[in-house]
UniProtKB/Swiss-Prot annotation:
Name of the protein in its database record: Choline transporter-like protein 2
Organism: Salmo salar
Keyword presence, Membrane: yes
Stretches assigned to the Cytoplasmic side: 1-32, 254-256, 337-364, 478-504, 621-638
Family (UniProt): Belongs to the CTL (choline transporter-like) family.
Side of membrane Extracellular, spans: 54-232, 278-315, 386-454, 526-599, 660-706
InterPro entries: Choline_transptr-like
Any one GO MF annotation of this record: antiporter activity
Amino acid sequence: MMELEGEKPNYGEPRKYDPTFKGPIYNRGCTDIVCCIFFIICILGYVAVGILAWSQGDPRKVIYPTDSRGQFCGQAGTPLETKPLLFYFNIMKCASPMVLLEFQCPTTQMCVEKCPDKFMTLLKAYANKEDFKYYKNFCKEGLEGLTVTQILSSGLCPAMLTPSKPFTRRCFPALDQKKGGEITVGNNSKFDDGEGNIRDAKDLVAGVKNATVVIEARQVVMKIFEDYTQSWYWILIGLVIAMLISLLFIVLLRFLAGIMVWVMIVMVILVIGYGIFHCSMEYVSLKSEAGSNVTLKDLGFQTDFSVYLHIRQTWLAFIIILAIVEVVIILLLIFLRNRILIAIALIKEASRAIGYVMSALFYPLFTFALLSIVIAYWAVTAVFLSTSNQPIYKVFNDTACDHSRKICEPANFSTSSMKAECPDSKCLFAFYGGETVYHKYLIGLQFYNVFLFFWCANFVTALGQMTLAGAFASYYWALVKPDDMPAFPIFSSLGRSLRYHTGSLAFGSLILSIIQIIRVLLEYIDHKLQGTQNKCTKFLLCCLKCCFWCLEKFIKFINRNAYIMVAIYGKNFCTSAKDAFFLLMRNMIRVAVLDKVTDFLLFLGKLLIVGLVGIFAFFFFSGRVKAFENTAPNLHYYWVPILTVVVGSYLIAHGFFSVYAMCVDTLFLCFLEDLERNDGSAERPYLMSDRLLKVLNKKNKPEPAE
């Protein structure tokens, strides 16, 4: 095969032959000590933030609805334990625009055992002993001896009750729409508001709409949560299947690398082809169904995502996307057919290396465990930080009042000057906040939590990359395998990485984290400016997002290769990054031909596993296989477990294939150095395998006869 020679512009001097070099250097010192110390200080600060958040936060604010006194409805061990639902005295006041600003209706709210199920006014209920007994379930205490007028003026009871249903632990009027568009509540289109006025049921719509706008998304979240509770067992089975397929694939790749790569290529084409066929059949079958020709634009956003599967345009979009992917893959395979042979040789060599370092296959489990700890710590800290505010009470009034929306204290509000100047006003719970130093810098603590999450997650990933790189480099540079390799390559490499190079790992992950935080901020700004019509701003923001996306990919590439050089030579991060970059630039053509084609083949492997498990999950959860029709759980959205299984399968496959990818990258960098250090002579023989020598049209010259 034709030799692949890369151009060698001025990117530093090629590596010179060193007879003492035997692979990863053992006599090394600590690198990037300043960054190591800074990282440790930041971790200690992160622990302090967590302790502070846990001491101030209260997750009950997320779980339970809160009444006008700031008490939690339905909380165990409190007087409100048996009253889990929140009841609004006058739901129509929720039509105020203030609801959208402060997420709070300007009406009294109290915890109740169950929602009202009948029409009733205080005036009529007061005259009937049984009715008034029922009515008092929705009133405050202290009604004895008071007249109807006194009760209403004191705000102890609502003027009326309407039939309601619980929704996200809140009582909302049981509105219904009959044929012709007539709105009813409790089968009535008119009702008495308790103040002598006959109101239309449509008047309740605005209040309910505004009251639910803040929690509308929670309906979807709650349904998704219910789906998870119904399907978690089957999701785990799907993920276990993905893990077993990934493990089987890796084992087969170890012994049958060449055959498995070609089988993988053919299978990917067939799986995507089947996807196109299935989508086409669905598209044709919907032709005769009424309403299936509605466009996605006309349909708009629907919380019930299964609606989209009854639209022909959805399946047409799937067909187009899959067809494009199929064509792109086939074209790449045609144009890269010769390069694929070289990449297969590199994968075979990686398989051989993994055969000597079998423990590397299980290292992703260690990385996964560390990442789980990081994610769990971040999530718990975020919840406690977001719930560490104190209840804030504000003045609410139906009429004009100078003190409206001002902060008040419910304990002494009845005797305050605010109440005297605004007799109709009420001091109600508004939201959670605070004026202390802690609350003033709360947003800073939340930002610190997010930033340290990115930094720690990237550090864990970097540790895995350097550990695997050190283990596989010790394999490559061993003259006699496995005699010249450490007894436990993974543990030896992990120990070196933590003992000497924590600073370098922290430095590289810090750079990447800063870029990721900037990308998050750009996404946040983009979300806030969605309504703007300034095209220049949109264009600038789009350019910045694109540039930082490219920069993140570049930094990940540099970091990955820098960690390999640190693992081998034990130099600091910047020097290693420069050496790796120059080495790759001196061999640009080989990088494009070998490394990237190999990455493409490994990506096809991940795609195959995701496709197989995804197809199985689709037919199971959608109930399209009669054998499993009664076994599959009944779900609101069957795409929830399908999507979870697909994403989880990709992450699992990525975890297993990341070992191969890191092995390939390490061997690739090592054999580039091998080509520069050695020339194949008896004094300077190549250390790469005979298979790679043959692919690259290189050979070691025999020792001269004596």
